[in-house]
């Protein structure tokens, strides 16, 4: 019902939503027949439906490499995230994880739900990994080794300073950016991007996730996960978990805005990285998550709901981003729109307002200087839908018929 209400409020979401639904069903039918590859692509859909859709942009050989890269790192992340594993057991596994990808027999019981299945049947991932080209294997092994070592370091170390924060995000996400750049280069479709730009691509996504997932991480049992740097949150509260309490709402929002401002420092590097891409499929694969990230930050900024539940873009807006992010002009336009949205929420009384506005103005200037803003229509933000009630009813009926056909064909 929530989706239907959102469509009635935003009728122009309908077409992108239908396209997204059809694309998802198409992706489900593209599962390879080989058992190990079938497992990998099915598992990809279970652990990240959005990534499973975005990866379809890539040619088959590169798609396979990126799929395995993602699952290997997701498995590594599952070990790191499982707070029930004793430190003396977890650290050696993280450090040696890169060796296990060559072992068809290795598995490790941890995680929950689909992540437990991934870990229990990791031999399928190893089997698929061993069928990749050597350059792909070397890139995946190298990044997995470096990431595992970095994760192990922060198992025993808190994120105290913003430098620690950048270092942690480098290990768990910046290295993903470096690895993807290596895979793109190994495919022969892209020049090798600089480490600094690749790192920023990962940091921007990771910091967005850390901001959005505050409540989930702080409520993790048996032990909470704390990724917000003490250097930032200690300016507002005595303990990180204090941010979720209603009596600290004003300070919590100020701290949140500080975190968002920190994340915005990576945007210009991300725009440069995407501008330098040549292959249209790789471009879409990289650009869609970045647009989703700036959109998510715009939703989270100055929003107390981050400390009450999950804040994310509505499904129709997500569908628009996936459908309409095709060129660099689209990216500049989306970043411009979401930055304007974010800027409109900045309160001059916020302690970081000046810094936030400075970073947003720099992003807006980069988008304007591209000279492309007048060449595309803004699909991302619409103030009020200009539709008559009759048209809305007609759209609702059409949607009901289409959804009935889509779901009816399954039975």
Curated annotation (Swiss-Prot):
It catalyses: 2 (2E,6E)-farnesyl diphosphate + NADH + H(+) = squalene + 2 diphosphate + NAD(+); 2 (2E,6E)-farnesyl diphosphate + NADPH + H(+) = squalene + 2 diphosphate + NADP(+). PROSITE patterns: SQUALEN_PHYTOEN_SYN_1, SQUALEN_PHYTOEN_SYN_2. This is Squalene synthase. It is an enzyme of class 2 (transferase). The chain crosses the membrane at residues 388-408. GO terms for cellular component: endoplasmic reticulum membrane. It is a single-pass membrane protein. It comes from Solanum lycopersicum. Converts farnesyl diphosphate (FPP) into squalene, a precursor for sterol biosynthesis in eukaryotes. One of its GO terms (molecular function) is squalene synthase [NAD(P)H] activity. NADP(+) binds at residues 49, 74, 212, 312, 314. Mg(2+) binds at residues 77, 80-81. One of its GO terms (biological process) is farnesyl diphosphate metabolic process. Its cofactor is Mg(2+).
């Amino acid at each position: 019902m929530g989706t239907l209400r959102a469509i009635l409020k935003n009728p122009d979401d309908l077409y992108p939503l239908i396209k997204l639904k059809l694309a998802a069903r198409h992706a489900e039918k593209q599962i390879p027949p080989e058992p190990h590859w079938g497992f990998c692509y099915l598992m990809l859909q279970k652990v990240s439906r959005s990534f499973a859709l975005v990866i379809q942009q890539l040619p088959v050989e590169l798609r396979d490499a990126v799929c395995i890269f993602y699952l290997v790192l997701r498995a590594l992340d599952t070990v790191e995230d499982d707070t029930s594993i004793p430190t003396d057991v977890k650290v050696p596994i993280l450090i040696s994880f890169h060796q296990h990808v060559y072992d068809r027999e290795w598995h490790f019981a941890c995680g929950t739900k689909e992540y437990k299945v991934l870990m229990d049947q990791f031999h399928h991932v190893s089997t698929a990994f061993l069928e990749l080209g050597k350059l792909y294997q070397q890139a995946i092994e190298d990044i997995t080794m470096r990431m595992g070592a970095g994760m192990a370091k922060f198992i025993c170390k808190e994120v105290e300073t913003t430098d620690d924060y950048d270092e942690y995000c480098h290990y768990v996400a910046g290295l993903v950016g470096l690895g993807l750049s290596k895979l793109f280069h190994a495919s022969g479709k892209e020049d090798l991007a600089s480490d600094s730009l690749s790192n920023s691509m990962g940091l921007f996504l990771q910091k967005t996730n850390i901001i959005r997932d505050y409540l989930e991480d702080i409520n993790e049992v048996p032990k909470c996960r704390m990724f917000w740097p003490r250097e930032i949150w200690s300016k507002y509260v005595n303990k990180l978990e204090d941010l979720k309490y209603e009596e600290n709402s004003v300070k919590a929002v100020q701290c949140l805005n500080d975190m968002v401002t920190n994340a915005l420092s990576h945007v210009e590097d991300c725009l440069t990285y995407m501008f330098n891409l040549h292959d249209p499929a790789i471009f879409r694969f990289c650009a869609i998550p970045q647009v989703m990230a700036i959109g998510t930050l715009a939703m989270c900024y100055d929003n107390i709901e981050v400390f009450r539940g999950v804040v994310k873009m509505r499904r129709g807006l997500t569908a628009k981003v996936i459908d309409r992010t095709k060129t660099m002009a689209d990216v500049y336009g989306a970043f411009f729109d979401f930055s304007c949205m974010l800027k409109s929420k900045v309160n001059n009384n916020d302690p970081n307002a000046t810094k936030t506005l400075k970073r947003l103005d720099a992003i807006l200037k980069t988008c304007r200087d591209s000279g492309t803003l007048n060449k595309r229509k803004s699909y991302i933000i619409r103030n009020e839908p200009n539709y008559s009630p009759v048209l809305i009813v007609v759209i609702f009926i059409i949607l009901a018929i289409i959804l009935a056909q889509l779901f009816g064909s399954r039975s």
